[in-house]
Structures are given as C-alpha cells and as structure tokens.
Amino acid sequence: MPINGDGYFCLVKPVIYATKEGMKMKGHMDKVLAAAAAAAKAGEVPVAAAITDAKGDLIVLAENRMVRDGNALHHADLLAIEAAMAATGQSRLDGYDLWVSLEPCTMCAGAIAHARLRRVYFAAHDEKAGAVESGVRFFDNPSCHHRPEIYGGIG
C-alpha cells in the first residue's frame, strides 16, 4: 500500500480516510450527509451537495428543494453548482469538486460536465436514477465533452 509524505496510508480509489487530506474529505461528506438528513426532515428527497475549491475548502452546501420550491429542477447538485458559480463569479468551476449524498442523475451529470467540475464524490449509488456509475453512465458517452474524476460509494 502506498504511503504519502506524511507517513499515512493513501489510495486514490477507493478513497481511504487515513490521510490528513482524507480526514478533511470525510468532514465534507459528513456535512453533506447531515444536510441530506435535514432535507429529509423538511419533506424532501434526502439529498444534499457541496462544492469545494482547489484547496479543498468547502464554499457552498445545498439541499434538495424540489418539494419546498415546487420546482423539479431544484436538485441539490444543481443548486450547489449555481451557488458556487455565483460565489466565485465564474461560469466554469475548473479545479472545484462536487460532494453529493446520492449518485447524480442524468440532468445533474450534464450540469457537472458543463460546469467543468474536476471531481465528483458521492456517498450512495442510485440504481434507479443514477447516471454516473449506474444507469446511462453519462460520462462514458462519447458525446460527453468533459469527464470529471469519479469517486462513488464513499459515504
């Protein structure tokens, strides 16, 4: 098993939380999962998403708001991407990462590609509507113009 410069074990995939960076990553996913639980308490599908910058700092956290807003497009992934673009003043999020509690659907995968996110981390696979490692496997399609690194099932 490889060891990084800090003397901690590290792997790229699956993600191992034994490094200092890994513990920071675990903190991001813990925040996403807590926000997903809050969304469920609000009557939403329990999904939340966060965006981190190139340094790994969390810049936005969003919950599903489809029921509360009466808008089927208000998936947590899309809301997080939109908020990150507003916060940074950028239309593309090169070098930014998405953290989400559930595997993104086709609509959200399209937004991820257009936003040019660097990596996508998701906690749970979605055999019904997931489009990253399940279902249509959006980023494997030859017409997909941007393919982020994917780390699934890490919750």
Where are these regions (language model features)?
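Small-residue (primarily alanine) positions within well-ordered alpha-helices
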Residues: 32, 36-39, 49, 60, ...
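N-terminal amphipathic/hydrophobic targeting modules at extreme N-termini
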Residues: 1-2, 6-7
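Short beta->alpha transition motifs characteristic of CBS
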Residues: 59-67
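Zinc-dependent deaminase
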Residues: 9-42, 104-155
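A short, polar/charged loop-to-alpha-helix boundary motif
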Residues: 68-79
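Short beta-strand scaffold segments in enzyme catalytic cores
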Residues: 47-53
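Helix-adjacent hinge/juxtasegments
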Residues: 81-111
